Amino acid sequence: MKNRNRMIVNCVTASLMYYWSLPALAEQSSSEIKIVRDEYGMPHIYANDTWHLFYGYGYVVAQDRLFQMEMARRSTQGTVAEVLGKDFVKFDKDIRRNYWPDAIRAQIAALSPEDMSILQGYADGMNAWIDKVNTNPETLLPKQFNTFGFTPKRWEPFDVAMIFVGTMANRFSDSTSEIDNLALLTALKDKYGVSQGMAVFNQLKWLVNPSAPTTIAVQESNYPLKFNQQNSQTAALLPRYDLPAPMLDRPAKGADGALLALTAGKNRETIAAQFAQGGANGLAGYPTTSNMWVIGKSKAQDAKAIMVNGPQFGWYAPAYTYGIGLHGAGYDVTGNTPFAYPGLVFGHNGVISWGSTAGFGDDVDIFAERLSAEKPGYYLHNGKWVKMLSREETITVKNGQAETFTVWRTVHGNILQTDQTTQTAYAKSRAWDGKEVASLLAWTHQMKAKNWQEWTQQAAKQALTINWYYADVNGNIGYVHTGAYPDRQSGHDPRLPVPGTGKWDWKGLLPFEMNPKVYNPQSGYIANWNNSPQKDYPASDLFAFLWGGADRVTEIDRLLEQKPRLTADQAWDVIRQTSRQDLNLRLFLPTLQAATSGLTQSDPRRQLVETLTRWDGINLLNDDGKTWQQPGSAILNVWLTSMLKRTVVAAVPMPFDKWYSASGYETTQDGPTGSLNISVGAKILYEAVQGDKSPIPQAVDLFAGKPQQEVVLAALEDTWETLSKRYGNNVSNWKTPAMALTFRANNFFGVPQAAAEETRHQAEYQNRGTENDMIVFSPTTSDRPVLAWDVVAPGQSGFIAPDGTVDKHYEDQLKMYENFGRKSLWLTKQDVEAHKESQEVLHVQR
């Protein structure tokens, strides 16, 4: 197999190269950029100023991931139809309706020269490699461009910023289901009456649950703002919502993750069916990512601090994240980052380390704008009819007619939905609006921080709802729930839209001092799996996302608390244990045991529960690579599905009942598209089976007047009938299908980022990070102040030559990932030199 890096060095820059000695590195000229790749193809960039450093970064990204990045750019800006045709017109329209390009450009124009050098240098580096590709496409043009029939376009700073805006801000900090919630509330009021309907809504979508596990322990602090969902004043002010719920209009995807391009009616049917089967974990679900544990000096063994991160973005080919080392201009860092952002989301600089998980704070509100019946395009605000902002957008369509449409915007934000029957337009207001580029650069600048104070200064500038984590060489650890959050009016129910007439406009933004944070917690560790950051902190408004007594973070807490101290290897092994852990066994086994305790030993329902009792909840593959060694998850899947049908689903009017029917286990033949979580229906059911122990008022009896035991046993009877017909009467012989894991060739938007044949599979689904990394400070087993590892599957590269030759680093981390392995991350010049596979030297004048 050809080594593309060696090919590049020999064919493109041989005249620029000379032997790299360490003294020469220190004395390199201001125009020089050195690119050194390690044995896994991960590049380290050396330059003396910011522009040259990020020029080198953009240059290597283009070498490795040019097609992936081209499709990410088109996906985030809504220009996919231009190269892939009419099936992507609706997708492009949806993308363009969701952002305001002039606002992003204005932020870029306001940057300091130093910060502008980051984006400009990166774009210039991308373009430099594209220019070389254009001079030698027979060798250097990635095959995917020929497969799909177009060529790469040049980059500008706007494109670099929009990759971040579209894949981080708009994916992980833009989720809202307030209009969906209003549709649900409308149906609940029709079924139960106004007062009781609101009470049932509170049972299904509570705002705060005091029993929810928190990343910051109660003894450390509680969230100071109190929310009373019984004091909602805005619900009564809203019009009915009888249109289809907006969640049904999200573009449907197939099992391969590709957009299906369906008619509106068929799309809604597909989304409803997919969500009913897979819930938030499935094809029609929402991101439910990621996990992290940080162990400080009082709990780490043979080290002062250990950080293990597992961001769960989903699995893709090429890899979702990109490994890079940056050295010079005040930077000295190593790690990896999604879509090759110019700021490392996961990494360290030899003194501190950092990582992230999605925060799921509520930083987005929907304002119901009252439209003028006489003046189209006008809405009522502060007693006056105000003209909306608008812009015309034209979608260029490959082999088709261009389509022009209008994007509308009010003082609150872009218009997402219009209900002509009530003369209402729904505008999305983001607390981070206007702070997108500053948020990106906060990630970039944190790479220079050397202590908690410097690091939190950047955390304060990061406006998206993202959890940030910290560790340092002295064994200090910390956590901040970053983001900008609205200071809402009293009586504003953040789960629902509010009138946009002016009275309910935000008072401003809450100060950063209000953000949940902790430094060196008493427990000696920090753990998160997208759970609540702090007691009394309000959850996201997403109907599919709840913080309650049932939470998967308990699986991490339990493992960390089992040992007084953990070594680095033990901390890494938590990945293996949690990735195979059934998430419902711990929650419902006591209920099942209580219900069957009076049954005879021969009763098959008791046999099912005894099988669960003997099981540790860990799913392991049989030798056939297709089935589980234990049938526990299959039993829980069928039982939970039956229980939900008899309880939560029965209590919710159609079509919203489909939101709560998924057990959380069902998936496609290719496996889940992302992280597995406890389903929203299961979380609601868990509160119900707790009875008086639950802090959530049970406005409607989910057991419909029957004893809880009777319903549990009936669901167990369903389970036995279903599984015994399928596998026979001997439970010990049941071999139930395992979940697979697929690295899909379509990005999370559903847009191709590779050819279909680049899809990669592994037999075992692992509920773990898309990448995993571990950083260990002051290890006693080494004379280095820090040791670091990661695994970025399938591999560093995404390059396939025009003749079909696959780069040697395309999938050389696939088996490593499957076996819970890891590779070293190098930082020092000596280590990079010792593990050098190839080298390239550029001389570039600015």
UniProtKB/Swiss-Prot annotation:
Propeptide residues according to the Swiss-Prot or TrEMBL record: 236-289
Binding site for Ca(2+): E178, D362, V364, D365, P494, D541
Main subcellular location of this protein, as a coarse class: periplasm
InterPro entries assigned to the protein according to its UniProt record, in alphabetical order: Ntn_hydrolases_N, Pen/GL7ACA/AHL_acylase, Penicillin_amidase_A-knob, Penicillin_amidase_dom1, Penicillin_amidase_N_B-knob, PGA_C, S45
Signal sequence region: 1-26
GO BP field: antibiotic biosynthetic process; response to antibiotic
GO molecular function, one term: penicillin amidase activity
Locations listed in the record: Periplasm
Catalysis performed (reactions): a penicillin + H2O = 6-aminopenicillanate + a carboxylate
Keyword annotations: Antibiotic resistance, Calcium, Hydrolase, Metal-binding, Periplasm, Signal, Zymogen
Gene Ontology, cellular component aspect: periplasmic space
Assembly mode: Heterodimer of an alpha subunit and a beta subunit processed from the same precursor.
Name of the protein: Penicillin G acylase
Species of origin: Escherichia coli
